[in-house]
Amino acid sequence: MSKTVTGPDGKCRCAWCDAAPEFNAYHDTEWGFPVIDDQRLFEKICLEGFQSGLSWRTILAKRENFRAAFADFDFRKLAKFDEKDVERLLQDAGIIRHRGKIEASINNAKRACEMVEREGSLAAYFWRFEPDPSEIAIPQTKSTSPTSVALSKDLKKRGWKFVGPTTVFAFMQAMGLINDHAEGCFLRPKIDEVRKSLVRPG
């Protein structure tokens, strides 16, 4: 069963908030709120790729550095990065200096541009993979789902990299394609209401 923790303000939150003090603000203002902005969706899927094998705390601490280094995750600008940019980024101590992940982000920016041409927007594409409610497991008991596997497979077929099913599931949790706030978390009902009123892109 997923659990909650009670913060100093008396509010019950998802238990993972207890792992680091900075997680509370991220949890309360970002995680699980539905996102239909292409740039934010692209940023998140890139950062989830960088997180692979690391902790989200590490990535969150470096997020502003990533934004500065990667053209604020404007995928149209990032798609134009070349080998000189890769070498520059490999010298940037403010980010995760992993050549494969850096090159994957640039590659994915190019794929994102192609996707917008075909689909109209990244949001229209990603929200097509919003799971049916019957598929949703008990909150925070899974690290993948049939939909995250399907989305991962489709992204890879389109040439995206560092988009395995676990990475994609974390992306879906964070971007509000599912409401994975724990039962008892003070935000779970609020997220449900936001999701009900959301006009899905497409």
Regions found by a protein language model. Give the residues of each.
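HhH-family (HhH-GPD) DNA N-glycosylase catalytic core used in base-excision repair
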Residues: 1-202
